[in-house]
């Protein structure tokens, strides 16, 4: 987490790495399932507030292109896709295979977005 000043207020900027299948949508791979609109809307809001979003998925090729296009149709954009943010690479002088993030949101772990949404209201 990094703190930045906006309008004389200290704001914490977080990097969130988000899985696609089973997280942003119902897992129907290789198809795309129904959207998790509660999470998607929260991520759109958080990005508007300055948080950085990374799509972190096993999808590749056309499946990845389709997933990104699907997200964009719902208004969700990412700062990086299956890669570290440029400023992280610059800071550490390395592009690690492990994505650097403050929070990893994935259906194969505890569902952290539920706690995140409860904090927001």
Where are these regions (language model features)?
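HAD-like aspartate-dependent phosphatase fold
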Residues: 1-121
């Amino acid at each position: 987490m990094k703190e930045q000043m906006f309008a004389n207020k200290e704001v914490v900027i977080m990097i969130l790495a988000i899985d696609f299948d089973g997280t942003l949508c119902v897992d129907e791979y290789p198809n795309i399932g129904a959207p998790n609109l509660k999470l998607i809307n929260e991520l759109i809001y958080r990005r508007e507030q300055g948080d950085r979003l990374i799509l972190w998925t096993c999808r590749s090729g056309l499946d990845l292109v389709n997933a990104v296009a699907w997200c964009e149709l719902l208004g969700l954009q990412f700062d990086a896709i299956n890669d570290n943010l440029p400023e992280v690479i610059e800071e550490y002088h390395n592009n690690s295979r492990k994505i650097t993030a403050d929070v990893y949101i994935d259906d194969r772990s505890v569902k952290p977005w539920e706690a995140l949404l409860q904090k927001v209201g």
